[in-house]
UniProtKB/Swiss-Prot annotation:
Keyword Transmembrane helix assigned: no
Xref: InterPro entries: Asn/Gln-tRNA_amidoTrfase_suB/E, Asn/Gln-tRNA_Trfase_suB/E_cat, Asn/Gln_amidotransferase, Asn/Gln_tRNA_amidoTrase-B-like, GatB, GatB_C_1, GatB_Yqey_C_2, Gln-tRNA_amidoTrfase_suB_CS
Protein's name in the database: Aspartyl/glutamyl-tRNA(Asn/Gln) amidotransferase subunit B
EC number: 6.3.5.-
Organism: Mesoplasma florum (strain ATCC 33453 / NBRC 100688 / NCTC 11704 / L1)
Keyword Cytoplasm: no
PANTHER family attached to this UniProt entry: GLUTAMYL-TRNA GLN AMIDOTRANSFERASE SUBUNIT B MITOCHONDRIAL AND PROKARYOTIC PET112-RELATED (PTHR11659), GLUTAMYL-TRNA(GLN) AMIDOTRANSFERASE SUBUNIT B, MITOCHONDRIAL (PTHR11659:SF0)
Length: 479
């Protein structure tokens, strides 16, 4: 393996987050009863005609801009012709000749080093139906047919499994924060095809490539590449031919399995889509699409670290989930203690989410309630230990404010000087011999009295106010 350079290119199919399909008014919703989210256009009934989803084009433009691509404002579609059971029309509407985006780039970080990944193209198309293989039968669910997609294709510039995984993870983050797609790999809304070849170091010519289709997790991408590199290396060392073919990844054996040879590839006979005329996008509309794009995670990350003084590790944890990110940003509208918000989110709350296998938006917890609890600690109304009692309550019930819960539980800290003095005086009177040590060991004396005060009150005394009163009363007593 040391004698060969790994060459990897990646194609990602991304389902767009639209309410209806790319060329029909049928709804888009994952997990519905099979063959219910379809209409005449999806099923290719005679006389049905496609209508372009404007939102789909907007999401494609957002993505092109985030990937630093040249945007073609003259939108054209083509037909990709082939017969397969999951394609009722006998063709797929795509953009073979005029992709909406070209010549992009995306920076990734691998082992502390930054690498710029060249992206060749981004084009819009429609998805096919879903095939379900069960026993000896194949079932077809046309709910997915016609769903809007963008396909994003890199140039063959990736040189390791780690780089490939870093690229897909970074692309997923971009798409997630743009709200272009929910990018759930396990549900197929982000699908990855990896083209892999090897060549002797110093060689410029490409060897025969192998395409591994439909990898549905980052870990499977890594395993598939590592297996394929090892397989191809053995073939090359034995002077055997590497067949240019399409393979699939078997996650039970962690190996790739041949599907078909590239020599069997179909001639798709592309031609212009006659039912959709070219559309010239207005410059102002394209600019609005870009201007109204959501803030990317990279920008948020800089703001969290530089402005909010959150550690880079904590910022990265928050930014792994768009729900967590939105909750964090809503919470800090009500408090300035940004680091405390981050700490509670990534520790106590994340632990609860892991236990329940859910996301923060599914909890009853309100950002304003979390901020209120943090503010009450900062104001010495409650102690930090009381958050362990309050947090589980507000995560399950949002009907009461935090201060109402504090009063019901009677855990409000005592801050009134007279009230504290009335509690401290009896403790001092019971420990007069302790006062004799005050001149030599003042800290020991005051801490001992503070400990007894906390014991008497169950810890519900403002520590700063309590200590000030103790020092004042002790010094008055020994005068």
């Amino acid at each position: 393996m040391r004698n060969f350079e790994i060459v990897i290119g990646i194609e990602n199919h991304v389902e767009l987050k639209t309410k209806s399909k790319m060329f029909s008014s049928a709804p888009v919703s994952y997990g519905e009863t099979p063959n219910t989210n379809v209409n005449e256009t999806d099923m290719a009934y005679p006389g049905s005609l496609p209508t372009i989803n404007k939102k789909g084009i907007e999401l494609a433009i957002r993505t092109c801009n985030a990937l630093n691509m040249e945007i073609d404002t003259l939108v054209k579609f083509d037909r990709k012709n082939y017969f397969y059971p999951d394609l009722t029309k006998g063709y797929q509407i795509t953009q073979q000749y005029n992709p909406i985006g070209k010549n992009g780039k995306l920076n990734i970080n691998v082992n502390g080093l930054t690498k710029e990944v060249d992206i060749e193209r981004l084009h819009m198309e429609e998805d096919t139906a879903k095939q379900i293989h069960k026993d000896d039968l194949t079932y077809i669910d046309y709910n997915r047919a016609g769903t809007g997609l963008v396909e994003i294709v890199t140039r063959p510039v990736l040189r390791s499994a780690d780089e490939a995984c870093a690229y897909v993870e970074k692309l997923r983050e971009v798409l997630l924060f743009l709200k272009v797609s929910d990018v759930k790999m396990n549900e197929g809304s982000l699908r990855t095809d990896v083209n892999i070849s090897i060549r002797p170091f110093g060689t410029q010519e490409f060897s025969n490539k192998v395409e591994v289709k439909n990898l549905n997790s980052i870990s499977n991408i890594k395993k598939a590449i590592e297996f394929e590199v090892e397989r191809q290396t053995k073939l090359m060392l034995n002077n055997e031919i590497i067949i240019q073919e399409t393979r699939r990844f078997d996650d039970t054996t962690n190996s790739t399995v041949s599907m078909r040879s590239k020599s069997d590839a179909l001639d798709y006979k592309y031609f212009r889509e006659p039912n959709i005329m070219p559309i010239q996008l207005k410059k102002e509309w394209v600019e609005d699409c870009i201007k109204n794009s959501p803030e990317l995670a990279d920008i948020k990350r800089i703001k969290y670290v530089n402005d909010y003084k959150i550690s880079i590790n904590d910022a990265n944890i928050i930014l792994t989930s768009i729900e967590m990110t939105e909750f964090f940003e809503e919470t800090i509208k009500f408090t300035n203690n940004y680091t405390k918000v981050a700490n509670i989110l990534i520790s106590d709350i994340q632990a609860q989410l892991n236990n329940e296998n859910t996301t923060i938006d599914k909890l009853a917890l309100l950002p304003s309630h979390l901020a209120e609890m943090i503010n009450l600690v900062d104001q010495s109304v409650i102690s930090s230990k009381h958050t362990k009692t309050i947090l589980p309550i507000i995560m399950k019930d949002s009907s009461k404010s935090v201060i109402e819960i504090v009063e019901e539980l009677n855990i409000k800290m005592i801050s009134d000087e007279n009230e504290i003095a009335n509690l401290v005086n009896p403790i001092i009177e019971s420990n007069l011999e302790l006062l004799e040590q005050y001149s030599e060991r003042p800290e020991r004396v005051t801490k001992t009295i503070m400990g007894q005060l906390m014991k008497v009150t169950g810890g519900n005394v403002n520590p700063e106010a309590g200590m000030n009163i103790i020092i004042k009363l002790v010094e008055n007593k020994i005068k």
